[in-house]
Amino acid sequence: MPLTDFEGHGTYDPAEDYFPASPWESFHDLTENASFDLGGVVITAYSCPGHTKGSMVFLIDEEDGDKYLLTGDAANSFTFLYQNYSTSVEEFEDSLKALKEKVDGKYNKILNSHGTGVEKMGLLESLIKICEEIKAGKTAEVPFFYNGSSGLIACQPESENLNGNIVFHPERIWKKDTIIS
């Protein structure tokens, strides 16, 4: 995808409609462990490929003691992995395990970009377990259709105590099946 476009939940939008018209040279790459001190709030970036190859998660550490993990689309109660620009389930599982190792015990609330904006604690562990179940062929595989694309929902959406879910493509479970490079 060209840098002048970005994916907006199934539609490609001209980036200039959403970002300032600064020259690209003035932007800096966001990298793993990049940290920003905003005066009382420190934000640290972590890579979490899955929903997209460039998905990032942010640890927000406020001086009052609140610590948040902002997962956005990278990991939430209904994570999309079925699109062509998503990684395989196996790669997503690796990303989640690496992220968990880096941030475990460093946050007390999970924020995302959908629904109420708040996730239950234990989300990363639940998504890792769902990845394992997908790889083992032990999921509900409920058909899912959105915006001309289709995938399979791993767990029955009405399942009790469900903490996270994944929509995946059955032909992109293993690393070797990833389309993006």
Model-identified regions with their sequence ranges:
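Active-site HxH/HxHxD metal-binding segment of metal-dependent hydrolases
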Residues: 1-37, 66, 77, 133
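Core dinuclear metal-dependent hydrolase active-site scaffold
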Residues: 32-63
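Structural motif
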Residues: 41, 66-68, 109
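Active-site metal-binding loops of divalent metal-dependent hydrolases
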Residues: 50-52, 72-74, 81, 113-116
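Conserved beta-strand hairpin/beta-sheet module of binuclear metal-dependent hydrolase folds
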Residues: 57-76
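Short, solvent-exposed loop/turn segments at secondary-structure boundaries
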Residues: 81-86, 122-123
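Soluble or luminal CAZymes and related metallo-dependent hydrolases
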Residues: 87-95
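Accessory terminal helices/loops
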Residues: 94-181
